[in-house]
């Protein structure tokens, strides 16, 4: 009995050690950067989480914004559906995202909004085509679940504005739009931040 317990302890310790080593290796390795967008590229707007039925006008504004940058925009098949608190069923939301990932002509996937529901489709997705041909996944809030998963797989994503962000006061998001465009097209970004005097010098 004691021998069995010792064996189990040793076995579990080995697994934990291997997992820690793997995690450290993943942290050290550089993330793969998907190709930046160019004029003429196509992006897809999808809704992996919440409802957009009453936000079509705002999503259309997002489409017009992307088009003003020289991009083509396609909507997910179920973008404006409604199923309870979700934009569509788990299967349908997965279908839209999978279609966008698998289509080689689509160079970026832009989330229409967050809310809740993205985590429910993560395990339904097949990332084979994405790994073969990475593309930018864009959004924040609930879309962070996708960022986390894709970062774990080794790919960069953009934690940035969503389609519904176009519903904000235009004057307040001018700088957001500028930095968002630069992020998509691979232009250099620079930030000027005022430090807080209460911060300790050794803080990082």
Ranges and model annotations:
Residues 156-204:
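Conserved anion/nucleotide-ligand pocket segment
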Residues 127-150, 156-163:
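Short, acidic/small-residue loops that bind anionic groups at enzyme active sites
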